Amino acid sequence: MSVKWEKLEGNEGVLTVEVDAEQVNKGLDAAFKKVVKNVSLPGFRKGKVPRVLFEKRFGVEALYQDALDILLPEAYAKAVEEAGIEPVSMPEIDIEQMEKGKSLIFKAKVTVKPEVKLGQYKGLEVEKIDTTVTDEDVENKLKRLQENYAELVVKEEGTVENGDTAVIDFEGFVDGEPFEGGKAENYSLEIGSGTFIPGFEDQLVGMKAGEEKEIQVTFPEEYHAEQLAGKPATFKVKVHEVKAKQLPALDDEFAKDVDEEVETLDELKSKIRTRLEEAKKNEAEAAVRNAVVEKAAANAEIDIPAVMVQNETDRMLREFDQRLQMQGMNLQLYYQFSGQDEAALREQMKEDAEKRVRAALTLEAIAKAENIDVTDEEVNEELEKMAASYNLSVDKLKELIGNLDGVKEDLKWRKTVDFLVEHSTVAA
């Protein structure tokens, strides 16, 4: 097999690959064995048609696509290795020659990982954030806990107020016609949560249980359902019930409900302070680590291919969907409630995706420049920590993980960031 790599403008290039005729014939043989299983001719059972009759009846060309499916993946992988390139996109394959008894010649146009020209990455100056925990911080955390333990109590009298939960029926109309997803019964809506279209919740304020009302709103221009985007709508709403939050008293009993390890409210406050101090310390350390990476990446010269940003955006979108599912939602519901669509969300994520790609490429280049690598011992230590945190044996964890490349890569990036922090100046 012969391989030629031609660099084009930017980060693109073309591999020209020639696979010898002997390998092509092996590919055709394998393709025939696969295809003939479903072929029958007069006098021959399915799968028993001789090769010579098959080619006479259908032509050897009938085997080409299956042969290519067999030959191309291995040939492309070997060509990439031989050329010493790192593709970041799927190849655009162009078959130049495919004939029985001749070599296979194909071109593969790909985008490759860009060259990184490192700038300053040692001696970076970063600021450490204040880790002081104030009494106000403790009180704010206590108030949030109080909110979490609040009970919803039906308001026998009074009207809907901000922060209340209204149990409603609603049906929406655009141009006098109902639309899909615009109707629900006994829906619990927290007023002020921003769950519904802008203006909807505000117009419920002041309503009483049993009251009906027509609400006028306009769908956002970027609303995910194009047929509704930017259009005025009328919602018929009926309030069945109004519930208000009833906060528990901040006393020793509340403290014991929140944390069974404490006996008094003062003990709970002390524990909250300790946790906040630990959280702020971790936050400060993470901020320093992020800052040195961001500065090193900003100092590097990199022509980032659009496909790498797109791939990272895809990954971020999957991560976001997974987080939503853990909260009992999904992307479609998010689009419905937020008024966004996938294109708008992708655009919103694009800047962060590019920063992530730039940071990863920079860290990779620094690790190479400083000969930072990971030993088997370090990998085993990391696996032991992970196994302990999941209450698993190391062998079981390895079985679940399978390929350990991801673990090694994470460790390598962590060591590289450690290096940057050690060689930076952190101002208090």
From Swiss-Prot:
Domain PPIase FKBP-type as annotated: residue spans: 163-248
GO cellular component labels: cytoplasm
GO-annotated molecular function: peptidyl-prolyl cis-trans isomerase activity; protein folding chaperone; ribosome binding
Xref: InterPro entries: PPIase_dom_sf, PPIase_FKBP_dom, Trig_fac, Trigger_fac_C, Trigger_fac_C_sf, Trigger_fac_ribosome-bd_bac, Trigger_fac_ribosome-bd_sf, Trigger_fact/SurA_dom_sf
Catalyzed reaction equations: [protein]-peptidylproline (omega=180) = [protein]-peptidylproline (omega=0)
Compartments (UniProt record): Cytoplasm
Keyword Chaperone: yes
Origin: domain of life: Bacteria
Top-rank EC class of the record's enzyme: isomerase
Pfam family name, one: Trigger_C
Keyword Cell inner membrane: no
One of the GO BP terms on file: protein transport
Protein name: Trigger factor
Keywords for this protein: Cell cycle, Cell division, Chaperone, Cytoplasm, Isomerase, Rotamase
EC number(s) recorded for this UniProt protein: 5.2.1.8
Cross-referenced SUPFAM superfamilies: FKBP-like, Triger factor/SurA peptide-binding domain-like, Trigger factor ribosome-binding domain
Function description: Involved in protein export. Acts as a chaperone by maintaining the newly synthesized protein in an open conformation. Functions as a peptidyl-prolyl cis-trans isomerase.
Family indicated by similarity: Belongs to the FKBP-type PPIase family. Tig subfamily.
Domains: entry comment: Consists of 3 domains; the N-terminus binds the ribosome, the middle domain has PPIase activity, while the C-terminus has intrinsic chaperone activity on its own.
